[in-house]
């Protein structure tokens, strides 16, 4: 398991994937979240997508468009978070005004910390709920990563076994 601590600066550590969303719609992982300040935990997962948005620019002809230190091209992103309450499980915080980033509460609550949880979600179903007008068949999962909020608030999480499957 990888221990991830929130710090003063936000960061994302991501694995490039570039797989069709409908061909591999399931995301699985295990996590053990330490108690935190009672708000949403500052450590979570993030999934980046490209191609589903009808307004997306093509990058297919740019062979090296997703090499280097930056995140691969993406037009949509979903953060999978540990919410402030177990009752928020399955809740979606709508995208920002730009329509790119949304937040999905996978699990939550202080009462559920200090234990390992195995999670499996259908990211195609979550994507379709957030952006119903997008073309799911054209959407690609560009990366999966671990992110921190960078708020400086105390909060550690152990994350293991991140896997995209069909």
Residue ranges of model-derived segments:
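Extracellular/luminal beta-rich ligand-recognition
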Residues: 52-99
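Short carbohydrate-recognition loop motifs
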Residues: 1-12
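Beta-strand acidic-aromatic groove motif in beta-rich domains, primarily in extracellular
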Residues: 37-50, 55-57
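A short beta-strand element within beta-rich, extracytoplasmic domains
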Residues: 23-35, 142-148
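Extracellular beta-strand ligand-recognition surfaces/modules
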Residues: 43-45, 97-109, 113-156
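Extracellular beta-strand elements of beta-rich domains used
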Residues: 144, 160-164
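Solvent-exposed strand-to-loop "edge" motifs in beta-rich extracellular domains
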Residues: 30-36, 50, 124
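Extracellular/lumenal carbohydrate-interaction signature centered on repeated Trp-anchored short motifs
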Residues: 16-27, 110-113, 137-138
């Amino acid at each position: 398991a990888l221990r991830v601590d929130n710090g003063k600066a936000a960061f994302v550590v991501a694995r490039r994937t570039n797989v069709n969303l409908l061909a591999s719609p399931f995301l699985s992982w295990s996590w053990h979240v330490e108690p935190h300040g009672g708000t949403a935990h500052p450590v979570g997962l993030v999934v980046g997508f490209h191609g589903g948005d009808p307004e997306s620019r093509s990058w297919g002809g740019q062979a090296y468009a997703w090499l280097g230190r930056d995140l691969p091209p993406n037009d949509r992103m979903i953060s999978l978070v540990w919410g402030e309450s177990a009752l928020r499980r399955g809740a979606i915080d709508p995208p920002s005004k730009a329509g790119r980033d949304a937040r999905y509460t996978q699990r939550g609550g202080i009462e559920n910390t200090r234990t390992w949880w195995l999670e499996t979600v259908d990211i195609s179903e979550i994507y379709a709920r957030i952006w119903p007008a997008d073309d799911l068949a054209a959407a690609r999962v560009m990366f999966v990563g671990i992110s921190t909020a960078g708020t400086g608030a105390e909060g550690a999480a152990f994350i293991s076994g991140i896997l995209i499957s069909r």
